[in-house]
Amino acid sequence: MYKEPKNESEYEAELKNAPVAVVYLTATWCGPCRAIAPVFTNISNAPENSKITFFKVDVDALKKLPVCESLQGVPTFIAYRNGEEQERFSGANKVALENMVKKLL
């Protein structure tokens, strides 16, 4: 299951408290984002990934987040360990997302 922060402070607090996290930056108008959304949901719900906190962030709703201000495109996925960015990629790439999650386990 993933979390959908409603504002910047909620996102920052949740991410700070997550030892391991994957952030999915998306937009409602983005076709590739809609295509990869079910994959992200399935991965976030998988029991073997329960030690990872998953976030879905609407970049239009939270555009003041520093991570959103420097964004090149959506969808973008970012892996964090203890608050430090470990990896990032853009695009609706199922295999890249699965590999990112495996590296965090």
Curated annotation (Swiss-Prot):
The active site is at 30 (nucleophile), 33 (nucleophile). It comes from the Eukaryota. Keywords: Disulfide bond, Electron transport, Redox-active center, Transport. This is Putative thioredoxin-5. The record marks 31-32 as: Contributes to redox potential value. Participates in various redox reactions through the reversible oxidation of its active center dithiol to a disulfide and catalyzes dithiol-disulfide exchange reactions. InterPro entries: Thioredoxin (IPR005746), Thioredoxin-like_sf (IPR036249), Thioredoxin_CS (IPR017937), Thioredoxin_domain (IPR013766). The keyword Transport applies. GO terms for cellular component: cytosol. Belongs to the thioredoxin family. It holds the Pfam family Thioredoxin. Disulfide bonds join 30-33. Residues 1-104 form the Thioredoxin domain. GO terms for molecular function: disulfide oxidoreductase activity; protein disulfide isomerase activity; protein-disulfide reductase activity.
